[in-house]
């Protein structure tokens, strides 16, 4: 892949998501959905973003749900404007552990996500519990000159 090549993120994510449940090896059936369009990015930024989204989904599958849960849902929501790509990875699981801090987490996966979002994508990352249960991980990535602002049809 050349640096100038563009990648349709929706196609890539849609191909990866069905595989993730099989790899997770959890007893709880998890439904994974994508809402909205991630669109097209240059290859370097697309690679970093795909790594971030897959790590966040995998983290939700492995940690969000009680072993006794009958089912769970992880949803990737994307909203794209001319300047920003906003992505929320939402789960309807048990929420965050007491005292959890994204900035202080020593989990390797979250450290990698934090580094990719802030250093590679020049974006921001946040994580919070959802009233009624679950967690939202929110990332905002600027769409620079090299990022296509178009959303494929």
What are these regions (language model features)?
Residues 71-83:
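Short beta-strand/loop element within the Bergerat-fold HATPase_c
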Residues 121-129:
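Glycine-rich ATP-binding loops of the HATPase_c
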Residues 131-133, 138-153:
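C-terminal end segment of the histidine kinase catalytic
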Residues 30, 83-87, 135:
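Short beta-strand element(s) in the Bergerat
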Residues 112-122:
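Conserved glycine-/histidine-rich ATP-lid loop and adjacent helix of the Bergerat-fold HATPase_c
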Residues 3-23:
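Short beta-to-alpha transition helix within the HATPase_c
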Residues 7, 25-55, 62-73, 100:
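Conserved short strand/loop->alpha-helix "switch" segment adjacent to the catalytic nucleotide/phosphoryl-transfer site
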Residues 84-111:
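Glycine-rich/acidic phosphate-handling loop/turn and adjacent ATP-lid/helix
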